[in-house]
Amino acid sequence: GVGDLIRKAVSVIKNIV
């Protein structure tokens, strides 16, 4: 769902930072 996409996006952002 949308929540899963948001969590995945947050994980990717944390990996980049």
UniProtKB/Swiss-Prot annotation:
The record's section on Pfam families has: Antimicrobial_8
Which GO terms of the cellular component aspect does the record hold?
A: extracellular region; membrane; other organism cell membrane
Q: Give UniProt keywords alphabetically.
A: Amidation, Amphibian defense peptide, Antibiotic, Antimicrobial, Membrane, Secreted, Target cell membrane, Target membrane
Which coarse location class describes where this protein primarily resides? secreted
**InterPro entries reported for this sequence:** Antimicrobial_8 (IPR012527)
Report, as the record phrases it, the tissue specificity of this protein: Expressed by the skin dorsal glands.
Q: Which residues carry this modification: Valine amide?
A: 17
- Source species, domain of life: Eukaryota
Note the site residues: Involved in inter-helical interactions along the fibril: 7
**What about temperature dependence?**
Thermostable. Retains antibacterial activity against M.luteus after heat treatment at 60 degrees Celsius for 10 minutes.
Q: Does the keyword Secreted apply?
A: yes
Keyword Secreted (UniProt) = yes
Q: Mutating residue 7 to A leads to what result?
A: Loss of membrane disruption activity against bacterial mimetic membranes (DMPC:DMPG) and strong increase in amyloid fibril formation. Displays a significant increase in amyloid fibril formation
According to the record, mutating residue 4 to A results in: Decreased amyloid fibril formation
GO BP field: cytolysis in another organism; defense response to Gram-positive bacterium
Could you tell me one molecular function GO term of this UniProt entry?
protein homodimerization activity
Which cellular compartments is it found in?
Answer: Secreted; Target cell membrane
Q: What is the effect of changing residue 7 to K?
A: No effect on membrane disruption activity against bacterial mimetic membranes (DMPC:DMPG) or amyloid fibril formation
Subunit-structure text: Monomer and homodimer. Assembles into amyloid fibrils. Under lipid-free conditions, mostly forms fibrils with a cross-beta architecture, consisting of stacks of monomeric amphipathic beta-helices arranged in an antiparallel manner. In the presence of bacteria or membrane lipids, fibrils switch to a cross-alpha conformation which may correlate with its antibacterial activity.
Beyond the main fields, what else does the record say?
The amyloid fibrils are cytotoxic to PC12 neuronal cells, whereas the native peptide displays relatively weak cytotoxic activity. Interacts with mammal mimetic membranes (DMPC:chol) leading to transmembrane pores.
Role, per record = Shows antibacterial activity against B.cereus, L.lactis, L.innocua, M.luteus, S.aureus, P.multoci, S.hominis, S.epidermidis and S.uberis. Strong activity against M.luteus (MIC=2 uM) compared to S.hominis, S.epidermidis and S.aureus. Acts by inducing permeabilization of bacterial membranes. Forms amyloid fibrils which, in the presence of bacteria, aggregate on the bacterial membrane leading to severe membrane damage and cell death.
Put simply, this protein is called Uperin-3.5
